[in-house]
């Protein structure tokens, strides 16, 4: 077994401001036990108060691959548990949902009613850090009580419920309020894997496991491949009502094969495994079906690949989708008239139901036309499913014996198709965090601002601290994969603004947010090294980023 070299660098409790956030990476000094210098990320994180203690443990996993474990800050006696009230909507729409936030007048009205019921409620103004296209004044929240433990808030929640409101108990350390984040004391726990393409002789890649429709844990995916290191990857379908669980909810390419369409033009991590290099790119989808040799005549739109027709997780597909054609995170858009392609990678059987399913061989020649959906995809071939008005359109071009031309492409920002080869992998993400070394957090563009919800989704997903997974590239061309634990009193997590700050502190010049929350996981040599936030432990995920000790080609 490969020997592991390790050392700990304990940083001073306070440093002059000029040394807190150097622009580029630094090199950790080797100890006597380790004569070979191992490159580590930059010396300190721009996270919380400037005087926080920070400890780093750097482990060399292989030549050109390091793991850096970072702890920053410590227990903060000013933090506590509190009850947060779901404020009923002031909209005339009787179906309008309650929200964590409201305008000041309505929040004060709710607080007054609670105080009349014996609840010591308070109103707090929520100011969020300004991002490239979102943030600022989010509204007002209503909270009650200060508790030493979550369980201590039970009686207050009961009083709030009796007064006719819903509430939950949460930890104030998870707030991302702009007035307090730069004075936060932590604690934070992060893991960083750095891959240097100039030294690493293995392969950076991604994998969904045995098939797309059955998610697996990050450590399972790492173990199957013998990965040195792995993190969870992109967003994916969790709920069967939103599609096939495990299906990437955004662009995905595995070993050069395009197996999921993009969400609008959200950013993705594009990996060249042959060179062990990666880049952050905005990609859009283009799909079409026509008869071979028709030169564009009778061309049909192909709406996607390897997902349930009619269900578009995170939206951002086309103008016919409801409620929007734009990206809308954690929302499932619908379209009753779609055509979707399926590959053998999808799973044991394609989605069943009414519609049409066309079976193609390895040369895309039609071998069967079925009047219902749901079959096994032939080895080396694929199928096309149509629903709604797509049925007659597909039937018109796909007769048995006809050879079709099927295009499935991801288009880059230059308007040209992404060139793929067997070493190409793409993992979806969002929002964008950094561009050219500058923070450029495009939360609204990438679908994290929900219309007409009183900023409630933004408040919980962007503004508040959560577990996060980050991927990016530094000025030296190294790829960095980062996890930050959260939803714990011993690890607060990061707001999206703090996520970008951390990426920049680590020397990244281009970076994006990957799937986080309960999905955030890092495994080293098959063993989980962070603390996933789900009560059940590791969450099965759609795909994972893998650092393999040897090349597959």
Question: Predicted regions span which residues?
Answer:
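Gly/Ser/Thr/Pro-rich low-complexity, intrinsically disordered segments
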Residues: 2-7, 16-19, 23-553
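Nucleotide/phosphate-binding catalytic cleft detector across ATP-hydrolyzing
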Residues: 13
